[in-house]
Amino acid sequence: LEKMLMCPVPSIGFDLLFRTGVLEHIFPELVALYGVDYQNGKGHKDNFYHTLQVLDNLAGKSEKLMLRWSALLHDIAKPQTKRYEKGVGWTFHGHDAVGAAMVPGIFKNMRLPLDHKLKYVQKMVRLHLRPIALTQEEITDSALRRLLFEAGEDLEDLLLLCEADITSKNPEKVKKYLNNYERVRQLLFDLEGRDRIRNWQPPVDGIEIMQVFGMG
């Protein structure tokens, strides 16, 4: 699977395994994403092919294997969290947290490393909705700081994953979403820079300088 993940267009191999029935035996959690349910004439998107599109989008931006795993698993809990709410439509509340909790079991079954790489993928899956939420509300410094703290050094990878998650066929929507993410990215980096300056402490203070030079 990892050889397929690292291909320029990973969806080709996964789609072939799916159509031949092989994928169901080696990765049933991924196959469970396939299909569209309807209620009151409303259907949700096919999350299997959406996931493959996200993976392809990301493959065009990053060659990091574990980030590609994150793309493959970002919506893995949608079957378990799928609900139809009257007046709202299909929802997948909590699929980020439930998906993160599923990652260790999937890694164990796939005989993947259960170390910092696992933790990284869990983090990406758990946080993949957070930047989206920031674009839909008034952005406060406290909300930005929470995301900075939780994403840590993996912030740019998280934003790449979020941008890859845009699979709309409407060019205007894609442009709008990308602009929203760019705004969030800029606000995050501006805040990070301000906080770094605010929290920086000089190695010596003014009193010490005066004492050294006999100015006190």
Locate the predicted segments by residue.
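Intrinsically disordered or highly flexible coil/loop and linker segments, enriched in small
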Residues: C7-F14, L23-I26, E63-K64, K82, ...
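Histidine/acidic-rich helix-loop-helix segments that form or flank divalent-metal centers
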Residues: V36-K45, L52-D56, L112-V174
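Charged substrate- and nucleic-acid-binding regions of tRNA-handling and nucleotidyl-transfer enzymes
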Residues: V103-N109, T167-G216
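A generic short alpha-helical patch detector that favors 3-5-residue windows
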Residues: D46, H95, Q136, E150, ...
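A ubiquitous short alpha-helical element
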Residues: Y38-Q39, G87-T91, L148-F149, F189-R196, ...
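A residue-level signal for conserved active-site and pocket-lining positions in enzyme catalytic cores
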Residues: L16-L17, V54, G99, V125, ...
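Feature representing long, continuous alpha-helical segments
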Residues: S70-H74, A97, A101, G105, ...
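Glycine- and charge-enriched loop/helix tracts that form the active or gating conduit
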Residues: L1-L72, I76-G94, V98-H116, D205
